Amino acid sequence: MLPSQSPAIFTVSRLNQTVRLLLEHEMGQVWISGEISNFTQPASGHWYFTLKDDTAQVRCAMFRNSNRRVTFRPQHGQQVLVRANITLYEPRGDYQIIVESMQPAGEGLLQQKYEQLKAKLQAEGLFDQQYKKPLPSPAHCVGVITSKTGAALHDILHVLKRRDPSLPVIIYPAAVQGDDAPGQIVRAIELANQRNECDVLIVGRGGGSLEDLWSFNDERVARAIFTSRIPVVSAVGHETDVTIADFVADLRAPTPSAAAEVVSRNQQELLRQVQSTRQRLEMAMDYYLANRTRRFTQIHHRLQQQHPQLRLARQQTMLERLQKRMSFALENQLKRTGQQQQRLTQRLNQQNPQPKIHRAQTRIQQLEYRLAETLRAQLSATRERFGNAVTHLEAVSPLSTLARGYSVTTATDGNVLKKVKQVKAGEMLTTRLEDGWIESEVKNIQPVKKSRKKVH
C-alpha cells in the first residue's frame, strides 16, 4: 500500500539542479583558505586545481578573465586565500567552487579583513562625499602626524620649506607601524583637535608592505579621521597603496610629498604672481595717467575754442554769410516766380475753353441728327419685316386651314388620325373644326384602294 502523502520524487537532473541552486543562492560568495594541488592550465587559459587541507579537498576552477588579475603564479603546495562562489557541475554531480580572486595566505587574510572593514564603513556612510571638509586656502598652520624618525616627515618638511618657508608646521609624533601604532595615531588626531593650533592635518607614512601599512587600515584610526573637526589629508605609502584612511580622509594624496604640496603655497609662484600683479598695476597706472593727460588736453583745447570773443567772431561771420545767401535766394525766388507766372499765362491762353465748347456743341448736334435718321430707318425696316412675318404666319396657321373647310380628327389617345387602320369600330373620335369640336363613334371602316399610276 502507498502512504496517503507520497514523498517528492526527483529525477537525477532535477536533483542536481536543485542542489546547485541551493548552493549558489544560500551560500553565496565565501572566502576559503587551503593548499593548491593538481594545478593545470590548458590552452583556454583557465586554471583548474584542487584546494585541500589536512582532512578534505575541493575541486576549483578559475576562469581566464579572473586569473588575469592574480599578481603571482600559483604553485603546487602553496597556501592561498581565495574568494569564490560554490556551485555544482550538474552533468557529473561534482561539487566545485568558481574562484573570483586569489592571494597568498598571509596577505590574503589581511586583504579579507580590509575588504570587510571597507564594506562596513562604507555602509555606515563614512566614505560619503557629503562629509568631506574643504581644505583651507591658504593654510595658516599645518599639523603633521607621522613618525618623527621616518622618511615621510623629512619629505614633508623639505617640500614645505621649499614652497612656503613662512608656513608654521606642528609635528604630532606617532608610531606608524606595530601594535601600538593605531592607538598613537588616534591620540595624535585627538590632541591636534583639542589644541586647535592648525587648520589642516597630514596623516601618513612612507611606503611598505600590506602588513607595514596595516595601522592605517585600523577601524579606530578611520573613525578618528572621520570625527576630526580639522580637515585631514591622508598620505600613506606610494600612489598604488590605498588604505581605509584614504577613503575616510577629506583628501587623499598619493605620497607624503604630494600632501605637502597640496596644503602649501608655492613661494616662487606667489612671487611671480606678485611681480606680475605689480607690472599690471604699473601698466594700468601709466595708461590711466596717459588717458587723463589726453583728456585734459582735449578739454583745454575745447575751452580755448569756446572763448566768447572767438565765438562772437565766428557767429558774426556766419551771420554775414547767411545774409548773403538769403539775399541771393530771395532774388532767385522772385525771378523764378515771374518766369513761372509768364508760363502759366501762356498756357491759360492756349487752354481757353470757349472754342472747345463751340466745337463740342456742333459735334453734338450732328450726332443727334444722325442718330434720329438712323432710328427712323431702322424702325421702318423693322415694321416692314414684322408685317411680312405676320402675313406668312397667317398663311401657314392651322386655323387658316380649318377656315378653308378642313378638319383634324384625333383618337382617344390624342394621336391625329392619318389612316383608317389607326381606329377600330366602336371607338370614339374627336374632330376639330374652325369653330369647335365634334365627338363621334366609329360605326364602319371603309378603306380606299389606291389607284395605280400608269407608267408611260
Swiss-Prot record:
Question: Where in this protein does the record put region Binds ssDNA, also required to bind the small subunit?
Answer: 1-103
- How does pH shape activity? Optimum pH is 7.8 to 7.9.
The record describes how the cofactor is bound as: Does not require a metal cofactor.
Pfam families reported for this sequence:
Exonuc_VII_L (PF02601), tRNA_anti_2 (PF13742)
Instruction: Give the catalytic activity.
Output: Exonucleolytic cleavage in either 5'- to 3'- or 3'- to 5'-direction to yield nucleoside 5'-phosphates
Entry superkingdom: Bacteria
What GO molecular-function term can you cite, just one? DNA binding
Question: What does the record note as the disruption phenotype of the gene behind this chain?
Answer: No longer processes msDNA correctly (when retron Ec78 or Ec83 are expressed in the strain).
Q: Which UniProt keywords apply?
A: Cytoplasm, DNA-binding, Exonuclease, Hydrolase, Nuclease
Principal cellular location given in the protein's record:
cytoplasm
Quick one: effect of changing D246A?
Wild-type exonuclease activity
Its subcellular locations are:
Cytoplasm
One GO cellular component, as annotated: exodeoxyribonuclease VII complex
What happens upon changing D241A?
Loss of exonuclease activity, still binds ssDNA
Q: Please state the Enzyme Commission number of this protein.
A: 3.1.11.6
GO BP annotations, alphabetical order: DNA catabolic process; mismatch repair
Q: Tell me, how does this one assemble?
A: Heterooligomer composed of two different subunits with an approximate ratio of 4:1 for small to large subunit. Also estimated to have a 6:1 ration for small to large subunits.
Give the function comment from the record: Bidirectionally degrades single-stranded DNA into large acid-insoluble oligonucleotides, which are then degraded further into small acid-soluble oligonucleotides. It can degrade 3' or 5' ss regions extending from the termini of duplex DNA molecules and displaced ss regions. It can also excise thymine dimers in vitro. ssDNA-binding requires both subunits. Required for production of the mature 5'-end of retron Ec78 or Ec83 msDNA.
Domain notes from UniProt: Predicted to have 4 domains. The N-terminus (about residues 1-103) binds ssDNA and is required to bind the small subunit; it probably has an OB-fold. The predicted catalytic domain is residues 104-266. Three alpha-helices are predicted in the C-terminal region (residues 267-301, 307-349 and 353-393), their removal singly or in pairs reduces small subunit-binding; none of the deletions have exonuclease activity. The extreme C-terminus (394-456) is required for exonuclease activity. The N-terminus (residues 1-257) at low levels does not confer processing of msDNA and at higher levels is lethal.
Protein family? Belongs to the XseA family.
Protein name (record): Exodeoxyribonuclease 7 large subunit
